[in-house]
UniProtKB/Swiss-Prot annotation:
Its EC number is 4.1.1.11, 4.1.1.25. It comes from Methanococcus maripaludis (strain C7 / ATCC BAA-1331). It catalyses: L-tyrosine + H(+) = tyramine + CO2; L-aspartate + H(+) = beta-alanine + CO2. The lineage of its organism: Archaea, Methanobacteriati, Methanobacteriota, Methanomada group, Methanococci. Pathway: Cofactor biosynthesis; methanofuran biosynthesis; Cofactor biosynthesis; coenzyme A biosynthesis. This is Probable L-tyrosine/L-aspartate decarboxylase. One of its GO terms (biological process) is methanofuran biosynthetic process. Catalyzes the decarboxylation of L-tyrosine to produce tyramine for methanofuran biosynthesis. Can also catalyze the decarboxylation of L-aspartate to produce beta-alanine for coenzyme A (CoA) biosynthesis. The keyword Lyase applies. Transmembrane segments: none annotated. GO terms for molecular function: aspartate 1-decarboxylase activity; pyridoxal phosphate binding; tyrosine decarboxylase activity. Belongs to the group II decarboxylase family. MfnA subfamily. The modification N6-(pyridoxal phosphate)lysine is found at K233.
Amino acid sequence: MDEQDILKELRKYRSQDLKYEEGYILGSMCTKPHPMARKISEMFFETNLGDPGLFKGTSKLEKEVVSMLGGILHNNNAFGYIISGGTEANLTAMRAFKNISKSKDKQQNIIIPETAHFSFDKARDMMDLNVVRPPLTEYFTMDVKFIRDYIEDSKNEISGIVGIAGCTELGSIDNIYELSKIAVENDILLHVDAAFGGFVIPFLDDKYKLKGYNYDFDFSLNGVSSITIDPHKMGLAPISAGGILFKNNTFKNYLDVDAPYLTEKQQATLIGTRSGVGVASTWGIMKLLGIDGYKKLVNESMEKTMHLVKKAREYGFETAIDPVMNIVALKDEDKHDTCMKLREENWYVSVCRCVEALRIVVMPHLEIEHIDGFLESLSNTKKY
């Protein structure tokens, strides 16, 4: 095949994909990247951060991006990497937890909520972790009292806690403030999965924050050891650009393996070959948008979220919880059936595991007319 025929054939395949801007994707935490990402991607498409000595400029960019993310998360000494996404970030954190626990002769018992992302199930299988699942409160957050009591009863058996800041299904935030105190008091590690919430919570206007809800989640809390934060979600970076940040660079000692044939003799990330596109795009987009740009982006998404909730209630639908961020769960006892019927009309939503509900993520690509069209279709679907 010649080049033109190849491109023509590839366009046929690409035409079968949904496009974010069409407004039918309502269940994804990813969105259309910022337009500048296309130019940056072309500039950095051949870079490989797996061998940083060959790509010194891109490697410097990664350190700058980690520093920028650390600034958002209140840590000027953060250490970490831009990697493939939240799954790799969470696996990396759990790998560090396991190795630190082994060095202290502790069992690898980790408290992880039912609302945690399925990447922690992968970590459990891969690393033979023992997982404790605490009960959830009515707000779908971990029961802190249960955790405190459990650790007091079995102090030497718990090596770490995972808290969620913007859970995949509902957007709920565990009480990281209290979990941090527990971690400090008991000298155990605390990882915060803010893959989604990391680019939402710092920019959220007070008017959208629920009364009585604690939104603290980052390194301003002494007990937080590590945080997952994904630029390719609400950060508008192209896929794949996930982030793992640790409190300081001492954690590197528990991640490094020898890599004698590379330009740097040790490597800490799970994936060896890493494109520099995610790093460079994240750097450029963060520099372009700045704090004010992300505040505007988040608050526009929250305005649309509130519109969705208001209109849904007018149709007679109820939310499982009041939205904590731009994720909405609409109660539905026949969630799987409804989801499939909506898919026949090209609407792609998802379902919650921990509650009978449809899950909608109000990402920047969604417009008011998309939301209104979806709710009309949902209402018609439920009539039959």
